[in-house]
Amino acid sequence: MKRFYPLIFSFLALGAQARELQINPGIRLPKDSLEASHLIQSLAGFLEASQSENSANTYVLPAEKFETYLLLDEFKGIEASSSFKDEHFYQPQLCNVAPLEEGQYWLQISYFGLKGDASILRASFDLIAHPDKDQFKFASPLKRNTRHWKEYKVGKSHFFYQDSLNEAHAYQLSTRFDDNLKSENKANIVYCCENLIAMERLLGLTYKIDYNGYNSSVWTVNEAGTKIMALGNDNASFENFDPHDLWHARLSMVISRRAVDHSVDEGCAYLYGGSWGYTWDEILKAFKEQVASDSGMNWHELKEKPQYFQTGEHRNSADYVVCALLVQEIEAKHGFEGVWEFLNIGPREKGNAKFYQKLESLLGISVEEYNAKVWELIENS
């Protein structure tokens, strides 16, 4: 068996350990040695910066930064192995360099780890290298791979699709919740893909062990007032429009979801968009039959120890439904301004003190009254 002993290009020292870019000796680098050096040095810089904030990576091609940020997120923590308890178990290897037009190159980078004589592949990426004076900038191949796709514009939203698009759903994505969330000036870029497998290849992720066995996902990035989404959930024509996910998507354009109370956020999504394809009324009916049918249910305890109920094959949090009922009551009394206050109490904390304080401020419901008032909302719903 022929063995390849890769060249090694060390580009970052981390304490006593160096992260190394390996280069197979059989690879065909640019014939110009200076150009080859610039390419490797720039790639090393890109990989080093990939572990930081996306916007701080100066090796990203500015014209395609949003598309590249989707792929760049997949580099985060790529070297670490929890199984082997090693933060730098997987090392990058430049496997292929192929020339394209205008001095560009198609690159393939894989991350391998060694355990004894066994080589373990974590992930493989495709990148397009663009010449920029004495260095290179890098981009996801997404733009290149979809250059013959169609585009549909509505408001500040751009949809890219291969064959057909449900324009009515596209319009809803662009306008629903905007009045309340004041998100009408935020831009959307949406790539509609058949499934996760197709989406990964379009973006430049040809393999990642993390996604073994999965065929559906949605990847999103928010940056400077623009949200880019790659839909890999049977959405090549944007037929599977989900108002629940839309709520989360539009909310994240005006405030980080990490900055709001998660249970209130989910309560809004249930109330305004249902869940798993079920309407709010269907969710509420299942909740009443499976959870609220227990007259001894203590809703205060439920807040600390979640309980779930089924709609079809899907689990739903009973606490999220309770929050939806509270949001409904708050909106009836204070409009969406009150809901916005309720959302912005900050991340959930043990004991939910801020949750109860804001609830008392908005609805006059104290901690002691919480259980009885929730029962009242359920009975009146």
For each feature predicted by the language model, list its residue ranges.
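Primarily extracytoplasmic ectodomains and periplasmic/lumenal surface modules that are beta-strand-rich
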Residues: 53-54, 166-169, 337
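Juxtacatalytic substrate-recognition/specificity segment
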Residues: 149-261, 354-355
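Acidic/His/Gly-enriched intrinsically disordered linker/tail segments
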Residues: 237, 256-381
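Soluble non-cytosolic domains of exported or imported proteins
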Residues: 30-41, 163-172, 233-241, 258-263, ...
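Solvent-exposed, polar/charged alpha-helical surfaces in well-ordered, non-transmembrane soluble domains
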Residues: 37, 41-48, 175, 240, ...
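N-terminal low-structure segments adjacent to metalloprotease catalytic domains
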Residues: 17-150
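Short N-terminal secondary-structure initiator segments
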Residues: 81-110, 241-252, 263, 269-270, ...
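Bacterial Sec-dependent N-terminal signal peptides
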Residues: 1-22
